[in-house]
């Protein structure tokens, strides 16, 4: 009985730690997302009207593709990842419940969103060079 209580307390403590680690990572990714969207907008604003017209269709298609790609990528279960692919907060995944798994999906989406947006900024900066 005492062992079970101790085990449950450890389990709860590990879950709280996992949640804290996830909250910290969410804050970082959300801050990155704000910056990267701002940079993308600035990059776009630097184009002439003519350049914007040339790129408009491509840009619209890119937004859609980024969204779909990231939704697919974010559905990959942490259990399908190798240790080297896992972020620090994911190494506690054995203590996750459904809510934490759902939150991980959101984080993976944001991470992908940021990465693809950064790649797009690089592309746009070179498109007319």
Regions found by a protein language model. Give the residues of each.
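N-terminal alpha-helical modules
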Residues: 1-129
């Amino acid at each position: 009985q005492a062992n079970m209580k101790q085990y449950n307390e450890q389990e709860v403590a590990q879950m709280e730690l996992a949640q804290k680690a996830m909250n910290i990572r969410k804050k970082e990714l959300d801050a990155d997302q704000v910056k990267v969207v701002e940079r993308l907008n600035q990059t776009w604003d630097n184009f002439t009207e003519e350049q914007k017209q040339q790129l408009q269709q491509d840009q619209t298609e890119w937004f859609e593709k980024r969204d779909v790609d990231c939704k697919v990528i974010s559905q990959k279960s942490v259990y399908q990842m190798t240790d080297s692919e896992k972020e620090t907060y994911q190494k506690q995944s054995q203590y996750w419940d459904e809510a934490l798994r759902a939150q991980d999906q959101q984080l993976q989406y944001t991470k992908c969103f940021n990465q693809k947006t950064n790649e797009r900024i690089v592309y746009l900066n070179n498109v007319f060079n």
